[in-house]
Amino acid sequence: MQLKIENIKISGAIEILDKLKLKGLKSVHRTRLIRLLSDKLQEVIEEEKSLKESYAAKDDEGKPIIIDDKYDIEETEKLQEDLEAFFNEKVVIDGGDNQVTIKSVKQSLEECDIDWSGQQAYDYANLYEAFEGGDE
């Protein structure tokens, strides 16, 4: 079993996991998965910044020009295309050492009795659908 989720959906998945009321080992597994996803999210944030910097106009020293806390982007359309592709890339957390954690968290989601609504309902569905591989 593995968790395979798009970069753009990692933050929502973390929020859903954080709202689950769990005890004991299930709580430990949830926290472990949150840590793994948080590490991936940090990578995504850094890579997004790097991508934006690569499209930013540069000053005489080769540093990106920032105006009103935003990069001065030279090729906006190309950046948007790359960002869309980047956000749709999937992060994979393989079973391996995390097999028990992934199965436990999926089971916790199935047993969850929270009535999700709005964006949280979409985030819950996206997270649940990100689990792949069944009971291998």
Model-assigned labels for residue ranges:
Residues 1-136:
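A composition-driven surface/loop motif
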